[in-house]
């Protein structure tokens, strides 16, 4: 089983790693914590290689001292960039300057799967530790590392990591 980003919680419920109530509780608390983070932005970039996006994001981070990174690796031809408003806007401008025109700004105010979400880690880890996890009855391919967890700590670590890492 697998679920992308928030869908990983659905996969855990379907695999009986957590109950439906626990899944809903975690998703709700995750959302509330994300809302408390600094505002951010996300943009879907189409038909640009990941290497090009990584290079531009890295240069923008270094040059203007901001956070911007590939966040959702939806397909080889659709990658979502996430970070500060300033960082995402600069990546869009540089992509367009290089001739890449397909950049679609998402209607969100959070920078999911980026270091902008770092403030959530300690609190969300506390929430994860309140949940009664079980090993999944069916294999779950985790988002951050593309592996099947072999223990409960792996399940928790992945849910925590996906707040600040690409999925």
Pin down the residues of each PLM region.
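Helix-rich "cap/lid" substructures immediately adjacent to catalytic or cofactor-binding pockets
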Residues: 1-2, 81
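Gly/Ala-rich beta-loop-alpha elbow adjacent to hydrolase catalytic centers
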Residues: 2-11, 19
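Alpha/beta catalytic cores of group-transfer enzymes, especially the acyltransferase/condensing modules
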Residues: 14-166
């Amino acid at each position: 089983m697998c679920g992308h980003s928030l869908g990983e919680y659905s996969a855990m419920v379907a695999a009986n790693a957590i109950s439906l109530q626990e899944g809903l509780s975690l998703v709700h608390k995750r959302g509330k914590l994300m809302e408390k983070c600094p505002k951010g932005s996300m943009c879907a970039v189409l038909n640009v290689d990941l290497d090009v996006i990584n290079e531009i994001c890295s240069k923008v981070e270094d040059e203007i001292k901001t956070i911007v990174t590939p966040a959702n690796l939806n397909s080889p031809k659709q990658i979502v960039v996430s970070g500060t408003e300033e960082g995402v806007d600069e990546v869009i401008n540089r992509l367009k300057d290089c001739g890449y025109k397909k950049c679609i700004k998402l209607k969100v105010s959070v920078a999911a799967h980026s270091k902008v979400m770092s403030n959530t880690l300690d609190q969300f880890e506390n929430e994860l530790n309140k949940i009664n996890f079980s090993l999944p009855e069916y294999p779950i391919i985790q988002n951050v590392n593309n592996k099947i967890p072999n223990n409960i700590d792996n399940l928790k670590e992945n849910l925590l990591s996906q707040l600040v890492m690409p999925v």
